[in-house]
Amino acid sequence: MATVGTEEKNPIGSASNTAEPNVTEPQKQYASGFKLTIIVISLCLSLFLCGLDQTIITTAVPIITNDFKAIEDVGWYTTAYLLTTSSFQIAYGKLYTTLSVKMILLMALAIFELGSIICAAAPNSTTLIVGRAIAGLGAAGIFPGSTLVLVHAAPMERRPALLGITTGMFGIASLCGPFIGGAFADGASWRWCFIINVPLGVITAVIVTFFVFTPVDPLYAEWTFKDKLAYAKIPEILVLVAALVCLVLGLQWGGTTYAWSDGRIIALLVVFAVLTTAFLVLQVLLPKSRTIPTSIVKNRNIWFASIFALCSSGAMFIAVTYLPIYFQAIKNASALSSGVNVMPLILGFLVMSIISGVITNTTGYYNPSMFLCTILASVGAGLVSTFDVGTPQPKWIGYQALLGFGIGFGLQQPIVCAQHVLDERDVPFGVAFINMMQMLGGAIFVAVSQNVFLNGLANGIAEALPGFNTHKIIEGGLTDFKNLFTSDQLPKAIPVYAHVLGQVFLIATGLCVGTLLGSLGVQWRSVKKAKVTEDQADVERK
C-alpha cells in the first residue's frame, strides 16, 4: 500500500532519524451489527451538534444585531466560525493520522463546548465573535473526525450510504436549527442558541468515550508525542490563518467601514498577499514544513473536488445566512416564522443528501450527483435572487426547495471522492482538505456578501432618499432599521433592501454555476471497483 512521501512522514526529532518500521498490516476488521449502529449514532450526534450550531444562529442574527447595535457584524458571526473551522482542517487531519482519532475528536468536542459557553455569556458583539471563532476551532476537528471514525468502522461499499445517513443528520440539525433558534430568540433569549450545545456535547462525548475504538496507525507507533505534534505543522497553519483573517477583514471593511483606497484596506490585502506567498514558498521549497502532502497536491481529482466543495458550500452558507434576513426584514416575519420559512431549503438539502448517497452506492459513481447539483442549484439560486417585496409564498417555497435539492445532491460527493481516489493513509488529509475548502467557501463568500449587502444598502438608500444619513443604518440592527425612516420614507427603503438581498443571492448563483468546473474535472471512477480491489488485498494478506 502506498504511503505519503518521506517529507510528510518524518517531521523532526528521533522519529525523523529512525528507519520506517517494517509493519505487516493485519486484515482490516470492520464493525457490524449493534456496534456499527452505536458508532453511527455517535457520528450522527456529533454532526448534529455541528449542524445545529451552524444554522441555529441564522434566525437569531437580526435580533442579536438589534441588541448589540451591530449590523456591520452580521457576517462576522458566521465568518469567524467558518474561518477557524476551515483553517485548522489540515492540522486536524495530520493529528488524526498520527494520534488516536477518538482522543482528538474528544478534544475537538471540548474546544467546541468552550466556545459555545463564551458565546452564551457574551456581553457584546466582539466577545460573541471570539466565542464563535473558538467554537469553529473545535468544529474543525469534529467534521473530519466523525468521517474518519466511519472509515475505520465500515467497508468502502457501505460508506456512501452511511455517509449519506450522517450527512443527513447534519441536514436534520440544519433543518431544526433555524426553527429552534427563532423560538429561542422570540420566546426566551438568543443565548439559548449556544447553551443548548452544552448538554448535547456532553452526551456525544460520553458515547464516543465508551463505544468508539480507533487504533493508531502502526506506522507512527514509534514516534514521540513531540514528533507527532510537529507533524501537524501548527506554525505554518497560523501563517495561513493570519493571511485569511487579513483577506476577510479587507473584504468586509472595504467600501463600508473604510474606502477601498484607504491605507488600512490596502495594507490588509498586501499582508494577505505576502503571507499567502510565504505559505506557498514553505510548501514548495521546504519539504519538512509542507502542510499539504505531495500525494494530494498532485491529485487532480482532489483539486477539482475542492473547487466543487468551495463553490457549493459558499452558496449554501450565503443562502442560510441571508434568507432569514429576507423574511424578517422584508416579509415582517418573526424569528420563529423565518425559521419555518427557510425549511424548504434545508429540507430539500436533507432529502437529496440521503438520496445522493443511495445513488452513489447503487451506481458506483458520484459524478452524476455532482452534475445534478450544478444544474438544480444554479437554477434554484437564480430564482431565489428574484425575491422581492411581493414574492408570493408558492414561489419562495419552490425556489428554495430547488436550491436545496441541488446543493443536497452534491455537498457530500467531494468527501466520497477523497475517500475513493486516495490511499487509506492519505484519506485523513484528503477529507480535511475538502472540509477546509467547504468551510473556507462559506467564510470568504459570506464576507463578500456582507460587503455587497452593506455597500448596496447604503448606496441604494442614498439614491432613493437623497440627504438621508446612511451611517445610521450601519449603526443599527437588521430589522429595527425600519425605525430610522418616516412613514413616507419606508415604502422607498424596503424595496432597496429587497433589491440588495437579491444581489447577494446572485453571488450564490455564480458559485453554483462555478461548481460546473469541479463536476467536469473529477474523473469517473467506480466505488464498486474499489471494493473489489480491497477484497483482493485482504486475500493477499491471508
From Swiss-Prot:
It is a multi-pass membrane protein. The chain crosses the membrane at residues 32-52, 75-97, 103-123, 133-153, 161-181, 193-213, 234-254, 265-285, 307-327, 339-359, 370-390, 396-416, 427-447, 500-520. It is found in: Cell membrane. Glycans are attached at N22, N124, N332, N361. Residues 1-10 have a biased composition (Basic and acidic residues). This is MFS thioclapurine efflux transporter tcpA. Belongs to the major facilitator superfamily.
